[in-house]
Amino acid sequence: CATGPLRPSIPIQRCLIMKRAVDIVIATLLSVLLILPALLVALAIKLDSRGPVLSRPHRVGRHGRMVKVWEFRTAIADPDAMETVGGCHGEQVTRVGALLRKLGIARWPLLWCVLNGDFSVVGPRAEMPRYVGVYPPALRKVVLSVKPGLVDLSSREAHAERALLAGLEGDALEEAYVEKVLPRRLELGKQYVEGRGFWMDLRILAGCLAGPLLR
């Protein structure tokens, strides 16, 4: 069922309840299926470098609420470093971390964010706080009216995004992300919010089967 307006009516609330139930089922099944591979990933991280297995970066959730998410640690970094699209300034990406980023495995622990209700399986991509600050006010209100997701309409353009940003560093990388990648993600996020529903979620999930689910 489509959700239509941003303010939930009784039918929309029923859709949201159904969506939450589907989120729990999918996240639970994937968590069970990935538990052994995840343990191997955790062991590889510990053997590769010192530090915790998981990192807790901040992301902006529904209605602008700040949430701390779970991801596999992929770098040795200053905990006070500023996070950007290219990573934290001064960070040193580990050998295992580089592979986890390339394969999209670093985001597997986000399944726990689905189970605890901060994320949905399908929803606009969660963004770093510094970039939410440049959202146009109208788009910000729309995109942040729903929970962020693991995958969305922009997931199918991930390869094109990586190609666009490949080889860029520092200010050039930041500029390309803010001026080219972010506006497209926001437009797709707006499309999702305005047309969201069971069938759209199903189409997005089906499209993600062509590549790694959590990339």
Question: Which positions does each model-derived feature cover?
Answer:
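Residue-level signal for the nucleotide or nucleotide-sugar donor/cofactor binding architecture
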Residues: 91, 103-106, 197
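Short, conserved beta-strand/loop elements in beta-sheet-dominated catalytic cores
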Residues: 98-120
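Hydrophobic structural segments characteristic of membrane proteins
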Residues: 112-215
